[in-house]
Curated annotation (Swiss-Prot):
Organism of this sequence: Dictyostelium discoideum
Signal sequence annotation: 1-19
Domain of life: Eukaryota
Record protein name field: Stalk-specific protein A
GO cellular component terms listed in the entry, alphabetical order: extracellular matrix; extracellular region
GO MF annotation: an example: hydrolase activity, hydrolyzing O-glycosyl compounds
Amino acid sequence: MRSILILLSLLLTIAFASASFPYQCGPYSCQFGQVCRIDNGVCNCIPINDCHEVSLSTKVVGTWVDGSRGNKRFTQYDITITNNLNTNIKQIYIATDYTLRLRDHSNTSIWNVNLLPNGILTLPSYQPSINAHASFTFGFILEGTQPANLNVLSVSF
């Protein structure tokens, strides 16, 4: 009985650890400045500049001062993910940093994208893929006028 409990505990630990890393290559498999590229389940690390399969573009929608929030300046951005492949992108993970200073942590400050607790952005459940040669747009409102630093961390197709 004791060995069964130990085995169950071990299996639960493995399951939890596996679920903690949402991308197949793992969070630390590629070096800084590289993209984890997953093609038919095969993981490769390539330099960001060599990742032509997908691109991110940032557009300023508008900037304003909000008197109800202490006269702080806010900027709304649209981010477009473009699939340059002849095949669908199954999943994409986008890294952020301290520059992703959301107005607040509500659904009115970020939309059409999932923000994971570790700051990584992923496709929402209602957008399971990005079709070949198509694009998908998400947006957010940031405090200030500095755009967020966004980098493709992992792409699966």
